[in-house]
Amino acid sequence: MNILLTNDDGIEAEGINTLAELLSKYHNVTMVAPENQRSASSHSITIYEPIIVKQVKKPYNVEAYSISGTPADCVRVALDKLVPDNIDMVISGINKGLNIGNDILYSGTVSAAIEGSMYKVPSMAVSAQFIKNKKENYKIAAKYALDMLNRLKKEDLKNDVVLNLNIPFCSEEEIKGIKVCKVGNKIFNTRFSEEIDEEGNKILKLEGDINEDIYDGTDVYYIRNKYVTLTPLHYDLTNFNILEETEQLFLS
């Protein structure tokens, strides 16, 4: 398969390079990723500035480019200019940290995959749980991504669907299996701490703690119970539950 590989942690991040090294043994890989760290970019794109594209050398068999823009920019530039007619699948990751629950709305990793689906290319986001002061399990995540890719080769995956794959932080032997599940609620209870600087300005810093109020059967629930989670996503944000009800407001 011809694969476009991107991320939001930057082209030198360990996660994307671990995945690129493994995938390039079995597939044709083109890496197009942000020049710098762009986590939590969501689906932002560059409008008022030029985008700089630089070719980058890698020690394994991939064609690689760094992009001065966002993760979504990377996919747009790749599919419009760099490899416009030759991509079977977009893979975004491996992200440093989970993209589950409400956090997917902020995620540059997930948004890059969604951008791929908007170009009618089947896409997948891959994320590995991050725990402070511990080594991320990128190699385990890469193996699961490759396995998922091999499974998808045999299926007629709809091109407007994004698969969101998340791997818990534990040994491979501790992983209980894979759960296909829905998106959960928030992972963290966040708040801003406040300080005042010498000029009287407020300095706000985002803080938070783990949200213990989680729902059974969701990605948040299964990750905490050491399952790999897989959730199909879609970029159509229409709330169909109240579409007809909303329409009635204008019929009276």
Curated annotation (Swiss-Prot):
Keyword Acetylation tagged: no
Subcellular location: Cytoplasm
GO cellular component, one term: cytoplasm
Molecular functions per Gene Ontology: 3'-nucleotidase activity; 5'-nucleotidase activity; exopolyphosphatase activity; metal ion binding; nucleotide binding
Binding positions (a divalent metal cation): D8, D9, S39, N95
Main location: cytoplasm
Keyword terms: Cytoplasm, Hydrolase, Metal-binding, Nucleotide-binding
Function comment: Nucleotidase that shows phosphatase activity on nucleoside 5'-monophosphates.
Family membership: Belongs to the SurE nucleotidase family.
Protein name as it appears in the record: 5'-nucleotidase SurE
Origin species: Clostridium botulinum (strain 657 / Type Ba4)
